[in-house]
Amino acid sequence: MSFLRPLPQALRAEAARIGGLAARCLVLEVETWPKPGLVSHVDNGSHTDMDAGSFRRSAAAIEPFLARLALAGIEGASMPRLRAIGLEAEGAMLRATGGVNTHRGAIFGLGLLCAAAGARLKGAQGTLGDVVERLWGGEILGTPSAPDSHGGCAALRYGAGGARQEAAAGFPTLY
């Protein structure tokens, strides 16, 4: 167990690098244009409650948590631990944006990929999606989705699988 032996500084530095790269991806996403209806550095799209500045503040606020998720992956953490870190990240995001959800989905999906990248540093094999599916897929589906979330509403209304099923299956749309 990793709490009995401290992790080498090189692994801690790599986890921080993973978190930094993930946060940079979030900033680059908001700087991508055109994307009709979505927030960019050019306009707010169809949104009145968020802008590029709120996305940048959010990305900066959640960066340390993305690094912690990578570190948790290195340490072989279970889904409940990843979920707890994700909820802390969500709180930081909401504080940074005045209560606006800019990156809840990214905290979930990209956070899992950060954890998988960490697990690969300790020898997990396969794509990041393979690692997510193998290490946490069952646990992702083992808890009920929030019925008031967008994904929960879509699942009820359309029978769509949503982000949780996509993640649990190893992100087959990506891989």
Residue ranges and their predicted role:
Residues 1-75, 79-80, 117-175:
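Phosphate-rich cofactor/ligand-interacting catalytic cores and adjacent structured alpha/beta frameworks
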